[in-house]
């Protein structure tokens, strides 16, 4: 049986790691490479670097941040998101040390580019990001750049699912609020035939366990809450105590 994964999420704005609250408020945490090094040391199964200010200003990927991280020599697989507009950006990101990429704005602007990217990098290297909220009349997908929501169907019509390996569903309105991930968002799996990653407001072992026991959910991301205490990754994994979760890793001091 494939083990479920715990993804450590590092949010970057203006080159600095930040705590993000509902895509509206941000508090500084420090240098991204320091957080990444900690997550690698504590045994995260993957690390996601999401640079949230790149696509909004047409800046392209943050290769400077990626370059600093690549020099760390970490063993944990790295996912990068932010400013990827097409094949050229995607190739640069991978050449600067990312193992996989996650795209968001590209789905809205040029979904046809996904095929080109996937043919170059391989479908397994491509993740699509879906910021969701449960509205009064159903699931709403958010274009975070202008904060405009569309019915989920509009987003799905744009996305060529055959060119992505996984989808990350983010509860953007509850991001940064402890234990607040809206599990109703998982109804999206009824419309999709893809493995799901979950993120946004996931902080407690009990909810993490519920989310990960969903058969289509293969991983969950935790962001702000891993910065509050040392060895937070090992603590969460130990509390879960599930054979379905990869075992906690403790770095040797010898």
List each model region and its residues:
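Structural preference for beta-strand elements that scaffold enzyme active sites
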Residues: 5-9, 46-48, 77-81, 99-102, ...
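Conserved, mostly hydrophobic/aromatic
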Residues: 11, 39, 47, 93, ...
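Conserved anion-binding
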Residues: 12-25, 98-175
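Short, acidic/polar
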Residues: 27-40, 86-92, 146-158, 205-208
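Charged helix-capping and loop-helix junction motifs
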Residues: 28-29, 60-67, 145-153, 179-187, ...
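Glycine-rich, proline-tolerant flexible connector loops at the mouths of alpha/beta enzymes
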Residues: 46-65, 105, 168-179
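Catalytic cores of alpha/beta
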Residues: 71-101, 183-220
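C-terminal helical cap(s) of enzyme catalytic domains, especially alpha/beta-barrels
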Residues: 113-121, 208-252
């Amino acid at each position: 049986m494939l083990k479920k994964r715990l993804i450590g999420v590092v949010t970057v704005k203006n080159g600095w790691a930040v705590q993000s609250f509902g895509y509206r408020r941000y508090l500084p945490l420090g240098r991204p490479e320091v957080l990444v090094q900690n997550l690698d040391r504590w045994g995260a199964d993957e690390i996601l670097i999401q640079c949230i200010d790149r696509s909004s200003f047409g800046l392209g990927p943050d290769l400077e941040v990626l370059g600093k991280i690549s020099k760390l020599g970490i063993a944990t697989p790295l996912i990068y998101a932010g400013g990827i507009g097409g094949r050229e950006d995607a190739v640069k990101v991978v050449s600067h040390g990312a193992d996989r990429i996650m795209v968001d704005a590209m789905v809205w602007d040029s979904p046809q580019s996904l095929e080109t990217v996937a043919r170059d990098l391989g479908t397994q290297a491509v993740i699509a990001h879906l910021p969701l909220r449960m509205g009064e009349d159903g699931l709403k997908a958010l274009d975070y750049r202008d904060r405009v929501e569309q019915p989920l169907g509009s987003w799905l019509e744009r996305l060529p699912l055959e060119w992505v390996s996984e989808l990350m569903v983010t509860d953007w309105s509850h991001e940064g609020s402890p234990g607040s991930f809206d599990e109703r968002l998982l109804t999206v799996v009824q419309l999709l035939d893809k493995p799901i990653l979950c993120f946004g407001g996931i902080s407690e072992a009990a909810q993490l366990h519920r989310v990960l026991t969903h058969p289509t959910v293969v991983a969950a991301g935790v962001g702000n809450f891993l910065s509050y205490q040392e060895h937070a990754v090992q603590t969460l994994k130990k509390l879960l105590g599930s054979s379905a979760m990869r075992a906690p890793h403790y770095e040797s001091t010898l």
